[in-house]
Swiss-Prot record:
<protein>
    <recommendedName>
        <fullName>tRNA (guanine-N(1)-)-methyltransferase</fullName>
        <ecNumber>2.1.1.228</ecNumber>
    </recommendedName>
</protein>
<comment type="similarity">
    <text>Belongs to the RNA methyltransferase TrmD family.</text>
</comment>
<keyword id="KW-0963">Cytoplasm</keyword>
<comment type="subunit">
    <text>Homodimer.</text>
</comment>
<keyword id="KW-0819">tRNA processing</keyword>
<dbReference type="GO" id="GO:0002939">
    <property type="term" value="P:tRNA N1-guanine methylation"/>
</dbReference>
<feature type="binding site">
    <location>
        <position position="116"/>
    </location>
    <ligand>
        <name>S-adenosyl-L-methionine</name>
    </ligand>
</feature>
<feature type="binding site">
    <location>
        <begin position="136"/>
        <end position="141"/>
    </location>
    <ligand>
        <name>S-adenosyl-L-methionine</name>
    </ligand>
</feature>
<keyword id="KW-0949">S-adenosyl-L-methionine</keyword>
<comment type="function">
    <text>Specifically methylates guanosine-37 in various tRNAs.</text>
</comment>
<dbReference type="InterPro" id="IPR002649">
    <property type="entry name" value="tRNA_m1G_MeTrfase_TrmD"/>
</dbReference>
<dbReference type="InterPro" id="IPR016009">
    <property type="entry name" value="tRNA_MeTrfase_TRMD/TRM10"/>
</dbReference>
<dbReference type="InterPro" id="IPR029028">
    <property type="entry name" value="Alpha/beta_knot_MTases"/>
</dbReference>
<dbReference type="Pfam" id="PF01746">
    <property type="entry name" value="tRNA_m1G_MT"/>
</dbReference>
<dbReference type="InterPro" id="IPR029026">
    <property type="entry name" value="tRNA_m1G_MTases_N"/>
</dbReference>
<keyword id="KW-0808">Transferase</keyword>
<dbReference type="GO" id="GO:0052906">
    <property type="term" value="F:tRNA (guanine(37)-N1)-methyltransferase activity"/>
</dbReference>
Length: 250
C-alpha cells in the first residue's frame, strides 16, 4: 500500500475539486500520496455540440452515454497511467462498497473510475472495459461523481501518512467489522451532561475495554447484520452482554 493515482472519466471534472482542494484528500494530494486526474468524454467528440449521449434502443425515458467518447477517454487515461489500472464503474447494479472492499482497492497503484450520467452507459462499454462495478447504497443519484468521490475519500484514508494520527484509520467504524464508539471532547460537562468517567481516568486498559463494549453495543442496536457475519470472541461476547445489562438497568 503506497501512493495512489486515480483517473476519473466524468462529464463534470469540476466536482472533483471537493477531493483535491479540501480536507484529508487535499492534504494527501499536496503530500504526493494521491493524484486525481479527470478526463471529460466531451473532449473526445467530433460534432459541434460535443454529444456524449443518445436515445436508448427499444425506447424508454432518458438518454444513454455513447461508447466512443467513453472509450477514447479511457484510452487516454490508460496511456497516461502507464500501468494496468483496474477500471471501476460506479453503478447501482454493482456490489455494495464495504470497508473490506476499500482495503483491497487501497492496495492498487492506480484506479480508473467511470462516473456515468443519464440512464447509464452503453452496456457494451461495460462488457469490454470494466473490471468491477461498485455501488455505495440502494438509492438513486444523478450520476457517478459522488460515489466516485466517496470511494476516493475512503481509499485515501488507508494510504500511509494520509491521516494525522497513525491509529485513526484503524479505529474508524467498520475497520474491524463494528461501528465506532462514542467520542467526546472538552468541556467535561455541557448542559448537565458529563463525559463518561472512564475516559477521564487515564487508565488505558479500562478505556480500551469501554470503547470496545460501546462499539459492540452500538453495532448490536444499530447494525445487527454486521454481527451476523462476525465471529465474536469470548471476551467480546462478555462485553456485549455487559452492555445490554447496563442498558436495561439504566
Amino acid at each position: 500500500m503506497g501512493n495512489l493515482r486515480v483517473d476519473v472519466i466524468t462529464l463534470f471534472p469540476e466536482m472533483f475539486s471537493a477531493i483535491t482542494e479540501y480536507g484529508i484528500t487535499s492534504r494527501a494530494v499536496k503530500q504526493g500520496l494521491l493524484q486525481v486526474i479527470c478526463w471529460n468524454p466531451r473532449d473526445y467528440t467530433t460534432d459541434r455540440h460535443h454529444t456524449v449521449d443518445d436515445r436508448p434502443f427499444g425506447g424508454g425515458p432518458g438518454m444513454v452515454m455513447k461508447i466512443k467518447p467513453l472509450e477514447d477517454a479511457l484510452v487516454s487515461a490508460r496511456q497516461a497511467t502507464g500501468a494496468a489500472a483496474k477500471v471501476i464503474y460506479l453503478s447501482p447494479q454493482g456490489r455494495k462498497l464495504t470497508q473490506q472492499a476499500v482495503k483491497g482497492l487501497a492496495e492498487q497503484e492506480s484506479l480508473i473510475l467511470i462516473a456515468g450520467r443519464y440512464e447509464g452507459i452503453d452496456e457494451r462499454f461495460i462488457e469490454a472495459h470494466v473490471d468491477e462495478e461498485w455501488s455505495i447504497g440502494d438509492y438513486v443519484l444523478s450520476g457517478g461523481e459522488l460515489p466516485a468521490m466517496v470511494l476516493i475519500d475512503a481509499v485515501t484514508r488507508l494510504l500511509p501518512g494520509a491521516l494525522g494520527h497513525v491509529d485513526s484509520a484503524e479505529e474508524d467504524s467498520f475497520t474491524d467489522g463494528l461501528l465506532d464508539c462514542p467520542h467526546y471532547t472538552r468541556p467535561e460537562v455541557y448542559a448537565d451532561q458529563r463525559v463518561p468517567d472512564v475516559l477521564l481516568s487515564g487508565n488505558h486498559a479500562h478505556i480500551r475495554r469501554w470503547r470496545m463494549k460501546q462499539s459492540l453495543g452500538r453495532t448490536f442496536e444499530r447494525r445487527a447484520d454486521l454481527l451476523e457475519s462476525r465471529s465474536l470472541s469470548g471476551e467480546e461476547k462478555k462485553l456485549l452482554e455487559e452492555y445490554l445489562r447496563e442498558r436495561d438497568d439504566s
